[in-house]
């Protein structure tokens, strides 16, 4: 099977002046009238089965290998290395100003809550020395927490870089599997019904490009910046939200105009009807 010529062409390769749905109908009628149709159907089934199995295996490799590389390198290589450097060199607690602001706000809330609990009688009235000692203990706890967060961010950068390298290596040295996987994905997407295509298009656009998507992008950007220990600059986040979804919307509309409108015009019509 591995030496079979994969004659199953992707949907992109079948685009032309005649819509793909009409050409597939005529191809189906011609095959049903052909005397050797049964052998061809069995051969196509074997090729399709090989394509599906190979694509799923390759997809699992693309997911599992980078994840395993990330976790193993973080636990066994980068984790101990960063912890050693962090403890020996007494590195700074904070990597950026955003961490400082969150730490100071956390300490301030603790102090205010302490005074509030004493005022309402939830805690007995404490002396100034005891209050300062509790605040000091909380400050040390917060300092340790953010030192761990800073070290973890450095580990994330190194481990994620190793994951990206392993992912690119899989794509670089698995070109045949990648081409089979691309063909499988194209056939799967363009094999959906027009209603299903329109549904997923609307779901994608409303989720990533819709009027409510900026809130999701804001949360996502804050999480990504914090993951890598980068400053959570509000101006940068708002600039990203103002430009990236627009660029994504432009690419998506171009895809509809350039490919989907020729491959499946009925799906485009269904999409417009459902979107109205």
Swiss-Prot record:
Keyword Membrane: yes
Keyword NADP: no
Pfam families: CemA
GO biological process: potassium ion transport
A GO molecular function held by the record: antiporter activity
Entry-linked InterPro entries: CemA
Alphabetic keyword roster: Antiport, Chloroplast, Hydrogen ion transport, Ion transport, Membrane, Plastid, Plastid inner membrane, Potassium, Potassium transport, Transmembrane, Transmembrane helix, Transport
HAMAP family with a match to the protein in the record: CemA_PxcA
PANTHER family: CHLOROPLAST ENVELOPE MEMBRANE PROTEIN (PTHR33650:SF2), CHLOROPLAST ENVELOPE MEMBRANE PROTEIN-RELATED (PTHR33650)
UniProt-recorded name of the protein: Potassium/proton antiporter CemA
Gene of this entry: cemA
